[in-house]
């Protein structure tokens, strides 16, 4: 098959021969991966689609920065589930993007396993691999015991509280000294997965996510090529912050901050959950209580990155550099991009309340803080030549990094959040019940919303639905396999 015959964006859709005066129209609010995926699907189905994006760029919380002279993902950076079942895998294979696998299946640390790491205490002493392996095993046993606590409880509780109960019941699992500091580092990494502190994470829901097989892989080329492919040729209006959405029986009118109005048959809303929770967008009429409560019941986590480019590589050739400490907040984590990409870059990651504190600092203050950690671990560390600091929590276009399972989350909240309200459709990572917080979850959610929107509009207009949606996964025979490495 001629690659040029493939519709850019992973959806091969035949043109619909319309028997109406004008094509059906949809406004997509948000130009992140969910929004551009939805727009791509509808555009390929011969709908008139307008994407309104508040930023001066597409991608949303998928943001690849090139100011270091190499791609640095300051938002999402992993493919969670390096397998053909991942909805993004066929598109990644088609575009020839490389993946660096950082963990296999069932790693207790999620996107990392402890195959390539170096942990240090605050005195700069490296923790032995035997100690780390022993603590990792204990950490797994503690988490297994929290499941028993959950089964005994009628109501939800924080995961940290459950861990405390486990240690009270099983004193032999309590650790001391350097062992306990390594355990705190493991908790720190768990908090990073949820972008929330352990005293906020739901015991009932923390391990209920459907994790795909194949482990986790870094996007070596960054995520932007995927956004670029999906967005190509779409009508995307940048710097258009939506302030009001008015729905009528036969259409919807969207108003932006500068007073511009857009009208269409329907609207797909893909703005981040944090923006919806802040009530920045006014709905007329108001959303029904079941929808507004779903927005309120979902939690939003924060994880920020401090990326630093150096002239020389002075650190060990391992994937992860970590500093252990007496509490999770006192621990530190550096991702070594030189190992995965060959670029002399370290990325420090901060999650939960610590990520909020980082946002209050200037870029220089944030870099100085993490460099003080790095110099305790590696006294010969040099100063970075360039640096980048993300602030997803205070960014008015995101107001958070991704959704998370807070204590007391209702079982049906994801379904309610994703459900349409008349001609308003909702998509994004928070709308993905099985894969929230992931890029492929956001992508699949956008495709699903577009599919539902298309079918309903065509039915309302009495137009035959001639479209058979074909995602790239249905074309596996003509798509290159994933390029995966780990050295």
UniProtKB/Swiss-Prot annotation:
<dbReference type="GO" id="GO:0005777">
    <property type="term" value="C:peroxisome"/>
</dbReference>
<comment type="pathway">
    <text>Amine and polyamine degradation; spermine degradation.</text>
</comment>
<comment type="function">
    <text>Flavoenzyme involved in polyamine back-conversion. Catalyzes the oxidation of the secondary amino group of polyamines, such as spermine. Substrate preference is spermine &gt; thermospermine &gt; norspermine. No activity detected when putrescine, spermidine or N(1)-acetylspermidine are used as substrates. Plays an important role in the regulation of polyamine intracellular concentration.</text>
</comment>
<dbReference type="InterPro" id="IPR050281">
    <property type="entry name" value="Flavin_monoamine_oxidase"/>
</dbReference>
<dbReference type="InterPro" id="IPR036188">
    <property type="entry name" value="FAD/NAD-bd_sf"/>
</dbReference>
<dbReference type="GO" id="GO:1990534">
    <property type="term" value="F:thermospermine oxidase activity"/>
</dbReference>
<keyword id="KW-0576">Peroxisome</keyword>
<dbReference type="InterPro" id="IPR002937">
    <property type="entry name" value="Amino_oxidase"/>
</dbReference>
<dbReference type="GO" id="GO:0052901">
    <property type="term" value="F:spermine oxidase activity"/>
</dbReference>
<keyword id="KW-0560">Oxidoreductase</keyword>
<keyword id="KW-0274">FAD</keyword>
<dbReference type="InterPro" id="IPR001613">
    <property type="entry name" value="Flavin_amine_oxidase"/>
</dbReference>
<dbReference type="GO" id="GO:1903602">
    <property type="term" value="P:thermospermine catabolic process"/>
</dbReference>
<feature type="binding site">
    <location>
        <position position="429"/>
    </location>
    <ligand>
        <name>FAD</name>
    </ligand>
</feature>
<feature type="binding site">
    <location>
        <position position="61"/>
    </location>
    <ligand>
        <name>FAD</name>
    </ligand>
</feature>
<dbReference type="GO" id="GO:0046208">
    <property type="term" value="P:spermine catabolic process"/>
</dbReference>
<comment type="similarity">
    <text>Belongs to the flavin monoamine oxidase family.</text>
</comment>
<dbReference type="Pfam" id="PF01593">
    <property type="entry name" value="Amino_oxidase"/>
</dbReference>
<feature type="short sequence motif" description="Microbody targeting signal">
    <location>
        <begin position="485"/>
        <end position="487"/>
    </location>
</feature>
<keyword id="KW-0285">Flavoprotein</keyword>
<protein>
    <recommendedName>
        <fullName>Polyamine oxidase 4</fullName>
        <ecNumber>1.5.3.-</ecNumber>
    </recommendedName>
</protein>
<feature type="binding site">
    <location>
        <position position="53"/>
    </location>
    <ligand>
        <name>FAD</name>
    </ligand>
</feature>
<feature type="binding site">
    <location>
        <position position="242"/>
    </location>
    <ligand>
        <name>FAD</name>
    </ligand>
</feature>
<dbReference type="GO" id="GO:0050660">
    <property type="term" value="F:flavin adenine dinucleotide binding"/>
</dbReference>
């Amino acid at each position: 098959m001629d690659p040029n015959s493939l519709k850019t964006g992973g959806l091969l859709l035949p043109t619909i021969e319309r028997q109406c005066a004008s094509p059906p129209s949809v406004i997509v609010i948000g130009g992140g991966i969910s929004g551009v995926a939805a727009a791509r699907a509808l555009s390929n189905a011969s709908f008139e689609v307008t994407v309104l994006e508040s930023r001066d760029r597409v991608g949303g919380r998928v943001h690849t920065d090139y100011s270091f002279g190499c791609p640095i993902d300051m938002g999402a950076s992993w493919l969670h589930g390096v397998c053909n079942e991942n909805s993004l895998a066929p598109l990644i294979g088609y575009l020839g993007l490389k993946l660096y696998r950082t963990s296999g299946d069932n790693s207790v640390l999620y996107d990392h396993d402890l195959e390539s790491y170096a942990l240090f205490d605050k005195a700069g002493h490296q923790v032995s691999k035997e100690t780390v392996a022993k603590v990792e095993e204990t950490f797994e046993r503690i988490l297994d015991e929290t499941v028993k606590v959950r089964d005994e409880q009628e109501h939800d509780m924080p995961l940290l509280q459950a861990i405390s109960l486990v240690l009270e019941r099983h004193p032999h699992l309590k650790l001391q000294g350097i062992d306990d500091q390594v355990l705190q580092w493991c908790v720190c990494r768990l908090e990073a997965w949820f972008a929330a502190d352990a005293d906020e994470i739901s015991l009932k829901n923390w391990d209920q996510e459907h994790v795909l097989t194949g482990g986790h892989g870094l996007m070596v080329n960054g995520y932007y090529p995927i956004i670029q492919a999906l967005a190509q040729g779409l009508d995307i209006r940048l710097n258009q912050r939506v302030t009001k959405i008015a729905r009528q029986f036969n259409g919807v009118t969207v108003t932006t901050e500068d007073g511009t109005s857009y009208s269409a048959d329907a609207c797909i809303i893909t703005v981040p959950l944090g923006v919806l929770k802040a009530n920045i967008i006014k709905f007329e009429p108001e959303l029904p209580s079941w929808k507004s409560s779903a927005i309120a019941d979902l939690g939003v986590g924060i994880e920020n990155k401090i990326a630093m480019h150096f002239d020389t590589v002075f650190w060990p050739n391992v994937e992860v550099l970590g500093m252990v400490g007496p509490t999770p907040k006192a621990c530190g984590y550096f991702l070594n991009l030189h190992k995965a990409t060959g670029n002399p870059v370290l990325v420090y990651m901060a999650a939960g309340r610590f990520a909020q504190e980082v946002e209050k600092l200037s870029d220089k203050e944030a870099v100085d803080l993490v460099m003080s950690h790095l110099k305790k671990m590696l006294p010969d560390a040099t100063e970075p030549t360039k640096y980048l600091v993300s602030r997803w929590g205070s960014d008015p276009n995101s107001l958070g990094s991704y959704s998370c399972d807070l204590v007391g989350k209702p079982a049906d909240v994801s379904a309610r959040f994703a459900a349409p309200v008349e001609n308003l459709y909702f998509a994004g990572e928070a709308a993905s019940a099985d894969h929230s917080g992931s890029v492929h979850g956001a992508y699949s959610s956008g495709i699903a919303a577009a599919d539902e929107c298309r079918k309903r509009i065509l039915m309302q207009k009495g137009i035959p639905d001639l479209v058979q949606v074909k995602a790239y996964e249905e074309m596996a025979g003509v798509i290159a396999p994933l390029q995966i490495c780990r050295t």
